Amino acid sequence: MDSQAVRTGIVGAGFAATFHHACLQRVHGTNVEVVGVFGADRPQAAQYAERRGIRHFASLRELIEAVDVVHVCTPPVAHEEIAVAALEAGKFAVVEKPLTGYFGDGSEAFDGDTFPKGDALAAALASIERMRAAEADSAGRILYAENWVYAPSIQKEREIIEKTGAQVLWMHGEEAHSGSHAATYAYWKYSGGGSLIGKGCHPLTAALYLKCVEGRARNGRPIRPKAVSARTHALTRLKDFQDAGHLRADYVDIEDFSLTHVVFEDGTIADVYASEIILGGIHNWLEIAANNHRTICRINPNNAMESYNPVEEYFDDIYVVEKIGTKQGWTQPSADEDHFTGYPQEMEAFYRTVARDEPLESDSRLAADAISTIYSAYVSAESRGAEVPVKAF
């Protein structure tokens, strides 16, 4: 496929679809042709297509037939169905995070707060099995769109671990901001959970990835998660929460704070915070404590650029950084936010895999380990932090 254009289609027309298309324009070394888009919200998808000069497909089937790669940029509830359809047609599936999950029993009475979390774990593991089985039978592959894996700071830490033979003893990290873009995120039946999965999947997957890197470098096999404990809270739904108007506070049946503790099979650990209660922009970081070094990966914000603005209106038409809140005073504008968060590098790597069969760092097994850990964490949180074993794939 290296000598010809790789035809690509996007499913979904929201936030994720927007940055996927933007970063596809930055892929080098592979001729990527974005053919078109399909979305359940037809007016939104039509507008998305018109703005980018691409085709608006009337059905998912028509899009899949016209392309080599399908980008799954929908709410998580639709990920499995779309990815499996693409794989069954022999196409590659770029699947946004989280890979899959549990989205309720389909009843009107479903309540994300009260249902047995063991049901979610069993259903999520079954979904993973179906997706990986479809991949095994396909000429295509699942390309898991976990941008943290490809963030420059995480890849530099990968180099340090590989070249120094480091033993990673403890990692701790966070993804947090003032609330998700997506209206559907407020409901478990669409998002598969709240902060633990929606935010926590990023630093968690980066931590799982780096332990895989360490294991391959030191022992020839990845080091996998073994057990997890967690707590979750719905802080903006507390009876006494005072809404000052700065945080999203319309969540229906999901958590807005989580703390997850992972124990790996070698006894080392990782702690992941995730929340919707942090002002001042996105707070994304991962710190690594190893036997021979310490690294802090500052994904967002970072201090590559700092700017002081005395009057808010001066920066009215200037993008500073995602979810900054105010542009007045000292800020840390991201000179290239997509680059620091790994989006273009992710797409570049995926299309090297598609076109030239190069090794894939963020694959379905890493995604499966993340989902297995996350839903085991929900089982733990239901028991107020009891340790739960993790099935590793």
Task: Cite the ranges covered by each PLM segment.
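N-terminal Rossmann-like dinucleotide-binding module
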Residues: M1-R52
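Short acidic low-complexity segments
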Residues: I54-A66
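Predominantly a Rossmann-like dinucleotide-binding segment in NAD(P)-dependent oxidoreductases
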Residues: A136-Y251, R384
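Hydrophobic residues in well-ordered beta-strands that form the structural core
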Residues: A58, V95-E96, I142-Y144, V272, ...
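Charged, glycine/proline-rich intrinsically disordered loops and linkers
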Residues: G101-E129, T236-L247, E306-Q332
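C-terminal helix-rich "cap/oligomerization" subdomain common to oxidoreductases
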Residues: D2, I10, H71, K117, ...
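Contiguous beta-strand/loop segments that form the cofactor/metal-binding neighborhood of enzyme cores
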Residues: H202-P310, P344-D357, Y375-A377, P389-F393
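Beta-strand-loop-alpha-helix segment that lines the small-molecule cofactor/substrate pocket
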Residues: V69, E80-E146
